[in-house]
Design a protein with these regions (language model features):
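Glycine-rich loop(s) and the adjacent beta-strand/alpha-helix scaffold that form part
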Residues: 20-66
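Core beta-strand elements of the Rossmann-like FAD/NAD(P) dinucleotide-binding domain
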Residues: 10-20, 87-90
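An anion/pyrophosphate-binding glycine-rich loop and adjacent beta-alpha core
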Residues: 47-51, 57-178
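Short, solvent-exposed secondary-structure boundary motifs
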Residues: 8-10, 98
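A conserved short coil-to-beta-strand element within the FAD-binding core of flavoproteins
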Residues: 1-6
Length: 179
């Protein structure tokens, strides 16, 4: 920093002056591929440093969820993802480590530890109303069979019996269809 408040950056045979300088060296949220060099340099120069936080990063499973959902790696689908008052309607992607894709990466910029992230896997459908209608139209059809018309087959097979009781839709109570 210069005493007058600006900066001079020396580049080989040239000096470039400016009122402000931006130091960027990658994302600290990915320690295996990033560096805190820019932050250390800025602090070393006595500059004010905006506190860093992860952004545009995937969400990772805890051990129990990793075991339950690892086989869904590669499954993607459109979803509405929300946290607090912010929401995005973008694709999400199941990975071997967690959830990624445009929707999850965007909402990560608004998420703080302890916040709840809500994911609507059927954002363009009132799932409850659709299932109630199917109680008359397709009463003998299993819930998992119906859901495979709207969601990836591998996802439905994985969560059947965990998120919902797989039974004939005509036998399901309205309460059991709200999940």
């Amino acid at each position: 920093p210069l005493s007058c408040g600006g900066f001079n950056v020396v580049c080989q045979n040239d000096v470039i002056g400016g009122a402000k300088v931006v130091l960027a060296s990658g994302g600290l949220s990915m320690p295996k591929i990033a560096s805190d060099l820019a932050v250390r340099c800025a602090r070393g120069l006595g500059l004010e440093v905006v506190e860093t936080s992860p952004a545009l990063v995937p969400f990772t499973w805890n051990n129990a969820d990793r075991e339950q959902f690892a086989e869904l790696s590669g499954v993607s689908l459109p979803a509405t993802v929300s946290c607090g008052g912010t929401q995005f309607s973008e694709d999400i992607l199941f990975t071997h480590r967690g959830l990624s894709g445009p929707g999850m990466l965007q909402i990560s910029s608004y998420w703080q530890a302890g916040d709840v992230v809500q994911i609507n896997l059927l954002p363009d459908l009132d799932a409850f109303a659709w299932l109630v209608a199917k109680q008359s139209d397709e009463a003998k059809t299993l819930l998992s069979t119906l859901l495979q018309k709207q969601l990836p087959k591998r996802l439905v097979q994985r969560v059947s019996g965990v998120w919902f009781k797989d039974q004939r839709v005509g036998e399901a109570s309205h309460m059991s269809l709200r999940w």
